[in-house]
């Protein structure tokens, strides 16, 4: 559904409270005697705040389970489609990991795609990763003029004027446009969601304690449909492609949030951000 469909509705409807339907939920309505629809109840089936944190402190077991859950998240998405697959690859940890796992699981050639300005470090590192995993790689260079010219189309696609979201969406929108034009790929894997699940943003280093670290991860995940998922899903789907985001797999997220606060908190463990996934993958060297 798109908000653009509300543009031509009557003014009397605007006087009513219009809210966004929450993801992972079901609402029940019924006709009342006055011949209008009455809201009965909402049921939420999945929310990050409902996932319990357990005392999972045995690190070796945790690392093995992290890898297993992520591998299964990728595998189910690869196996459940017969359409041509491609991966977005920035050269960073998250997209590189997903691309490597897809390459392991996928039977056949895998095309990876990256985008950046001329001389971009992202393009260089994406090519290094592609060479390592053996994918057929496509680097798309974009100019500042093309970047700026696409902004109105991006805003129309994602239905948001949020400055950060729009800026972050341009690359996804542009590379999806190129994938549509230059290939037959229909299902696009990406590394989105990892920073929210694992506290990967730089400001997480400033968390006062591990409880605050956990609380902010859950808040970001609760609101992710307003920002990163909106950016990723709509930028890609606006070109007739289907996004696949394994880091937001329900079972993976539920398990990761069950790990004790302190073990997940890289600041507390004097480690790099997302250190658990780094160590989990290092053991398997995809």
Residue ranges and their predicted role:
Residues 59-66, 98, 122, 167-172, ...:
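Hydrophobic (often cysteine-bearing) scaffold residues that line and stabilize catalytic clefts
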Residues 1-160, 186, 282:
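Cysteine-centered catalytic environments shared across enzyme families
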Residues 162-166:
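Acceptor-substrate binding/catalytic loop of class I
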Residues 69, 220-221:
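Basic, alpha-helical interaction scaffolds
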Residues 185-215, 222-286:
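Mid-to-C-terminal catalytic subdomains of enzymes
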Residues 112, 150, 172, 197-201:
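Adenylate-forming
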Residues 178-181:
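Short, well-structured alpha-helical segments in soluble
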């Amino acid at each position: 559904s798109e908000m653009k469909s509300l543009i031509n509705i009557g003014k009397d409807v605007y006087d009513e409270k219009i809210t966004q339907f929450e993801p992972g939920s079901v609402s029940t309505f019924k006709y009342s005697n006055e011949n209008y629809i009455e809201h009965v109840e909402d049921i939420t089936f999945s929310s990050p705040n409902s996932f319990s944190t357990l005392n999972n402190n045995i690190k070796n077991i945790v690392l093995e389970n992290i890898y297993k859950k992520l591998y299964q998240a990728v595998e189910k998405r690869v196996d459940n489609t017969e359409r041509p697959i491609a991966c977005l690859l920035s050269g960073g940890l998250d997209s590189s990991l997903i691309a490597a796992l897809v390459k392991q699981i996928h039977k056949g050639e895998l095309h990876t795609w990256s985008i950046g300005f001329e001389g971009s470090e992202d393009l260089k590192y994406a090519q290094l990763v592609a060479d390592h995993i053996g994918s057929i790689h496509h680097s798309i260079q974009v100019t500042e003029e093309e970047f700026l010219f696409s902004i109105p189309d991006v805003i129309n696609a994602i239905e948001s004027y949020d400055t950060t979201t729009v800026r972050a969406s341009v690359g996804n929108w542009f590379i999806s446009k190129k994938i549509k034009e230059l290939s037959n790929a229909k299902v696009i894997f990406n590394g989105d969601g990892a920073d929210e699940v694992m506290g990967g943003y730089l400001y997480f280093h400033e968390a006062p304690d591990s409880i605050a670290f956990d609380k902010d991860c859950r808040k970001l995940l609760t609101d992710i449909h307003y920002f990163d998922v909106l950016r990723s899903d709509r930028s890609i789907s606006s070109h007739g492609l289907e996004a696949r985001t394994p880091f937001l797999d329900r079972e993976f997220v539920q398990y990761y949030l069950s790990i004790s606060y302190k073990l997940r908190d890289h600041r507390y463990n004097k480690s790099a951000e997302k250190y658990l996934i780094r160590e989990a993958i290092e053991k398997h060297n995809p």
